[in-house]
């Protein structure tokens, strides 16, 4: 297929920042590039990394600003989960969705965040105890995967 799809560029990235990937770039280079990009994003906020989402403000009150500023998620699943459920967040990043989910599922539920990036996992785990203290229960865990 030799069709060109320049109109299918990630909408979160200004077209001027878009670079075509060389055909010779192998899978391991791409995986390393993703790890590097999200590792850097765990250290300093990157506004063009993903799509902005409006979250329910009541769930954001206990989440530290550092996590909110470094959230690169593309959706808010809080309307689709219920008290007592177990939630799995793949690509959990800094943990924002996990900490929102922790509030929705309550003390009887459980949230598991999985990310492949050590820097993002470090950011998510950094505030685990503080958030558990705010909630009055600990129901979130983060795993590498």
Where are these regions (language model features)?
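Conserved alpha-helix/loop element of class I SAM-dependent methyltransferases that forms part
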Residues: 50-86, 100-104
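Electropositive phosphate-/nucleotide-binding environments in soluble metabolic enzymes
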Residues: 28, 32, 71, 114
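N-terminal auxiliary segments of SAM/dcSAM-dependent transferases
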Residues: 2-53
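Polar/charged alpha-helical tracts
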Residues: 36, 57-66, 129, 134
